[in-house]
Design a protein with these regions (language model features):
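A short, exposed helix-loop element centered on a Lys and neighboring polar residues
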Residues: 121-122
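Conserved glycine-rich Rossmann-like NAD(P)H-binding loop of the short-chain dehydrogenase/reductase
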Residues: 30-44
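Residue(s) in the substrate-gating loop at a strand-loop-helix junction
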Residues: 141
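Rossmann-fold cofactor-recognition segment
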Residues: 52-67
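Conserved glycine-rich cofactor-binding loop
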Residues: 14-16
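Active-site loop immediately N-terminal to the catalytic Tyr-X3-Lys motif
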Residues: 99, 146-152
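Substrate-binding pocket helix/loop in short-chain dehydrogenase/reductase
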Residues: 97-98, 105-110
Length: 157
């Protein structure tokens, strides 16, 4: 692997949107660095990217924890290469009426969808600003703009 290869970091590379984003970047020649809280769940995605001729690395990381985020970014930049593109794709919806929503659950959903986005984007942006290049992308759901029954915490995040 040469240092000239472009690296993408996809936070929240699950079985749907995040995984598809990682596959698309890999198809375009990026080294896909993908994360989930449980690294073992990334193996099917890594296998699929590699089978299609792409390069991929999986990392278990909790994006809500600043120390884990800092270590993740440092490891990727040191061992794989500079992160040229960053995609934040964490979201969680546990349907619940606003009347029954608990502060704890609301906070946990906000922590995953918002706070983790801040921590990870900040860590990557600090590197990108020094290099004067890079792209940061956030995915989102329409619940954030139009809400709906059972989406109080998810839409608020």
């Amino acid at each position: 692997m040469t240092r000239q290869q472009k690296v993408v970091l996809v936070i929240g590379a699950g079985d749907a949107t995040g995984g598809e984003i990682a596959k698309r970047f890999a198809k375009e020649g990026y080294v896909a660095c993908v994360t989930r809280r449980q690294a073992d769940k990334l193996q099917p995605l890594l296998d699929e990217i590699r089978a299609a001729g792409g390069q991929a690395h999986g990392f278990g990381s909790d994006a809500r924890k600043a120390d884990e985020v800092a270590a993740l970014v440092e490891t990727i930049e040191r061992d794989i290469g500079p992160i040229e593109a960053f995609v934040f794709n964490i979201g969680a919806n546990v349907p619940c009426s606003i009347l029954d929503e608990t502060p704890r659950k609301y906070f946990k959903i906000w922590e995953m969808a918002c706070f983790a986005g801040f921590l990870t984007a900040q860590a990557v942006a600090r590197r990108m600003v020094v290099r004067e290049r890079g792209t940061i992308l956030f995915t989102g759901a329409t619940a954030g703009t139009r809400g709906g029954a059972g989406f109080a915490a998810f839409a608020g995040a």
